[in-house]
């Protein structure tokens, strides 16, 4: 039986807001069942630090009694409104409480929404002991350049 754990609570917001500019109930902007609703989303508003973290709790699912087919799926895009830093990388980690279970860094975000995923190894999936305490952490990492490069 296929199960889907979807965002159902905010754990920490960092400097992230939703499409309306609010940092309240961010999970509601990324909890779509179809995954293709790009009209609501979350975005980091922090351009002064090297990284910004948001974490959401996931809905409870039962232990599948198998370590196969544990897949984290998300939809994302990147932008560089300043024109100086390039498109940031996005690290997504699956956590059980404060313990990291699996993580993947995406350094190739596109400027249009696209689907991304990573599959847990058997050992990562077997490390999950409480399927009612799963979370997703999103860390946006910006590379700062002190001066833009200009040809002379």
Regions found by a protein language model. Give the residues of each.
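Noncatalytic modules at the cell exterior or secretory-pathway interfaces
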Residues: 125-139
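Surface-exposed ligand/attachment interfaces on beta-rich extracellular proteins
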Residues: 46-52, 60-62, 111
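A short beta-strand element within beta-rich, extracytoplasmic domains
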Residues: 57-81, 136
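Short beta-strand/loop motifs in extracellular/secreted proteins, especially
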Residues: 52-54, 68, 86-90
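Single conserved hydrophobic/aromatic residue that forms the stacking wall/gate
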Residues: 142-152
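Extracellular carbohydrate recognition and processing domains
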Residues: 100-126
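Disordered, acidic Ser/Thr/Pro-rich linker "stalks" and the adjacent N-terminal cap
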Residues: 4-48
